[in-house]
Amino acid sequence: MQNAPKCYLPNSRKGRDVNFHDRGPETLKCLYDESEDNNNFTMHSESIGPKSLDSLSPRRLSNYSSAVDPRTTSLEDVPRLILTRSNSQEQTPLRTHTPVEYMSDSIHKSLADLQLGGSSYSVAESPVPVLQSSAVSEADDMASAHSAHPSRKASRSLRLFESSTSNNLETGNSTNTALHNVSSPLESVSERLSKSGSPSVGAQHDLDEVISEKDTSLSRRSSRGRSSAPKRRKDSGSSKTTATYIPHNPSKKSSQHLPLLPDASFELERSVSRSYQSPASTPRSSVSSVSSSPPEDHPFFHWNVDYPVTVRLEPFKHQVGGHTAFFRFSKRAVCKPLTRNENTFYETIEACHPELLPFIPKYIGVLNVTHTITKTEENDSTTEYVNTESSSKTPAPHKHTFNSCYQKKDYGYIPEVSVEQNRHIFPEWMLPDKRSHSYGSPKSLHHKSSSAGERPVSPTFVADIPPKTPWGTTLINRKLREEVLREVFAPKHARRRLGTRFHSRSSHRPSVFRDNSVAFGQLDNGNTSSRARDKDADPNKSLSCSVEDKHYDLHSAVAEENEEVDEELLNVPSNNQGKSYRRFSSDAVWEEPESNEFPRVSGTMEDYDSRESTGHTIKELRSTPNSHGTVPDDSIFAMDNEENSELPPPLEPAEIGDPFRSVNDPRRVLSLPHMASADEDHRIPASDNQNNNNNDANALAENSESQHSTQIERYIVIEDLTSGMKRPCVLDVKMGTRQYGIMATEKKKASQTKKCAMTTSRVLGVRICGMQVWHPWLQSYTFEDKYVGRDIKAGEEFQHALMRYLGKTDDDEDNSHLLVHHIPTIIRKLEQLEQIVRFLKGSRLYASSLLFLYDGEPPPSDKSSKEKVKPREIDIRIVDFANCVFAEDKELLAKATCPPQHKDTYDRGYVRGLRTLRLYFLKIWKEAKGMQIAERGYEDSLSNAYDELGGLMSYSNDDDSCGETST
C-alpha cells in the first residue's frame, strides 16, 4: 500500500488522498466529517451547503455531459444525478427512466436544460457504482498518478476511478472518452423542467457545445488547480475501488500570466489531466520543465494590453567620467550607443578569449533603438551660441570644492525599444510565433571583420538568408539575457506586484559609467579644468546631465586654449538658423574614412553593417539658449573630441510611421521632448492636442506625419556593474600610452599624442578620468571629473588621488577612513589581468578604461552573530572597446592606417599602466600600515607588515619593454 497510486480529492475546507491497491480489490470511502459511514455524502451536506448549477464551472458541467455522448457512450454508462430545488429541503430522487426512454431525445434535452436551469436547481451526488475500464487506461492512470505534478493530481480528482479486477470490461467505451464513464441510470428531469417553464433546446447541438468546451475548460482551469493536504484512509474488505467528487474551490488563484523560463521548476501544460480521446480527435501534448522550449501558447508572449511591445529607456544617473549617454534598460542592465565594432569585441572575447570574461562586464547584446525627431523644430530653431570667453571672468573653484549643476535639464530625445525591432536578441521560444511576420524578418549581412556570422538588425524586411549564428547577442550570458528581457517585457500587473514600475524605474545608486555631467561656475581662461559637483547635491534627486544635449558656440570653444573640439555639420539648410553639429568622443569615435562603406538608411530602413553604425552620432544636436549664462557641458569635453574631418555619413531619418501608435494619438506628438528649444511655449500641450483632434483630425494627422521622423540607432546592452550595491564608489582610469586606434587619421594621431604627453598617460600609462566616493560619516558623495585628472601629476598627486578614492579626505590626517583592506584584492586582480594581457600577442586595448568598484555603504553589523559580516570585494572591469583590436581580426589589421609598431608582442603601454597602479596601491598600503604600527610603538616590526603583499610583487622590474611609449 505504500506505493499505491493516490487520488487527490481537494476541498475548500479539507482534502483527502485515497490509496487504492494496484489491481487489488479495495473499496475507497470518501469521508468528509471523519466518519466512515458517510458514503451517501451529497452536496447538500450542512457543512458545505447547497451548490447551485450556475456556480459550477463549465469544466464540471462538461464532466457530467461528456460522459453521455450518444456517439461514444452506451446507455448503461449514463451517470445518475439527483436534482432538487435550491429553496427546497427535499432530496428525493426523481423518477428513473426505463431503457426504452433512454432511446428518445428527452434525455438529451434534459441535459441541455440542466445547463440552462441556472439557480433554480442544485446538484447532489450520491455514491455510484463505477464502470470497469480497460486495463490499458487503468495502467496509464496508475503510472501518471506517481509522476504527475500536484496540479495534475488535483485535476484527476474530477475522475471516478475503478478497480481493474472487475469482469465487466468495456474497452471501446472507456478508452475513447475524455473521462472515465460512470454506469448508472440517469434520473429524468424533463417533467420538472417543463413544469418550471425552463426553455428547451436541441439536445444534440448543446451536447456538441459542451463536449467542445471540455478541453478549453480543462486548459483554463489547469493553472489554478491546487491539491489540498492529503489524509490517507483505507478499507481492506472491498472488491472495487470507488471515489466520489468533493467540491473544490481554490483558496488562491494563480496569475494568468506567468513569464516562465525553459528551466522553470514547475510544469506548464496545455492540459493538466491526461486526455483519452477518440481517434477523430486531435491529440493534445504537454511540455514539462525538462523541455528545451516552451509551448507555442507560452503565456509570456500573449501580446495584449498587459504586455508592453515598446518600452522607454530611462537615463542612467550620475555617470563617472566621459560623456556618452548611458540608459537604464533594466535593474541589472544598462545600454549606451554602439560605437564601431564594440559588440564584436565582446563576442570575440566570448569565443576566443574566455580568460578575459571575469574582467569585462557581462555582454547581453545589441538593441535597435528608435529615436523620434521633430522636423518642424529643425526649421524653426535658431542656433544661439554662448561665448565661453564672456563667462570666464571668475576663477574656477578649487578642485576639492563641489558645485551643483544648475543647468536646466533638456533631453534632446528619449529612446524607445520595441519587440518588433529586436527579435534577434530574444530567444526563439520567447517570440510570439516562429513564422515570418508581417513586418518581416531582418535581412542578414555578413560582418566583414568578425567570425560571428550573419546577424539580424532591423526586423522590417523579409530575410533572404536565415542567420547561421546569432549576431548582436551573447552566447554565454544567456540566463542573464533572459532574466533581463523577462523583467523589461513582463506584464504590467506583474511589475506592479513586484513594486517596480518600469516607466518610473530609477535607481538610488549613482552610475559607474562615464558622466559628462559636471558642475561649473564662471570659467577662468587660465584654468578650465578644475570643476566638480557639489557634495550636497543628492544623486537621487535629479536625472543625469549626461543625456543633455546642450549646445554651444563651437567656434568659441575651439578658440579656447588647450581645448580641442571636433565638428561636423550634420545637415546644412539653406539658412544658417538650422545648423546642426555632431560631436564625437575619442572613446567611441569612428576612424574609418571610407564613407562609401556606410550606407544611409532610406525610407525602407535598409540594413547596414555594425561597423557602419554611427553610434551616438545619429543624434541631431541643436543649440539652445542658456538662461544662466554658463557654458553648456558639451564644451568642456573638447579634449576628448578628436579631430576627424572624414567621418561616415549620418543615418538618414527613415520616414516610417510608428506601428504601435495611431496618427491621431496625442502621445505620438508628445512622446519625446522637443530638441530645438528649451522654451516650453514651443511644446504642444496634451489638452491642446486633443482639442485639435476634435476640431480637425485630418489636419493633425498630416501635421504629425510632417513633424516627425524616425531614426534607428544601435545600442549595446551590458551588465549593470553597480547592481546590488547601495552606495557604489567608482574610479575610472584611462589605460595605455596610446589613445588613438589603428584607423586614425594623421590629425587624430597628432592630437592624441599631444594629449598623452600633457597628462600622466605618457609617463605612467594611466590617467584618472573621474571618480565618485561615498563617505558614510558624512552621508554624502564627492565627485571628481576628468579635468581634475588631467591636472594631476605623477608622484604624490597621483597617489593622493588614489587615496581619495579609498575614502581619504583632506581632514583625515591619520588615514582613519582609508579603506586599506581593499588594496590586497586590487593588487591581486591587477596582477592577474597583467598576466592575461601579456599573453594577448598582437592584440591592443587602445583607449580602453579600467573601472574600480566597491560598495561605500558598510555592511550591517549582526549583533546576534559572532562572525563579522564580510564586505563585498572590490571589482575591476575593462570598458570602452571601441578602439580595441584582437590579433584574430586579420582583415582589419591589414587595412590599418596606424598599425601597432610591435605587431608580434602584447600591448606594452597597457601593461605599463597596470604596473603603475600596482606600485602606487602598494605604496599606499605600506604607508598606511606603517603609520598604524608607528603609532603603537612597534617601528622595529615595520617590515612584518609588508609580508602580506610582498609575494604579489613578483614581476620583473627590469622589463624595458614597459618603458616604451610607442606600442
Curated annotation (Swiss-Prot):
Its main location: cytoplasm. Keywords: Cytoplasm, Kinase, Phosphoprotein, Transferase. GO terms for biological process: inositol phosphate biosynthetic process; phosphatidylinositol biosynthetic process; phosphatidylinositol phosphate biosynthetic process; signaling. Substrate binds at P728, C729, V730, L731, D732, V733, K734, M735, G736. The modification Phosphoserine is found at S86, S585. Residues 1-23, 41-72, 135-259, 271-296, 380-399, 437-464, 499-544, 594-665, 681-708 are annotated as: Disordered. This is Uncharacterized inositol polyphosphate kinase C970.08. It comes from Schizosaccharomyces pombe (strain 972 / ATCC 24843) (Fission yeast). The lineage of its organism: Eukaryota, Fungi, Dikarya, Ascomycota, Taphrinomycotina.
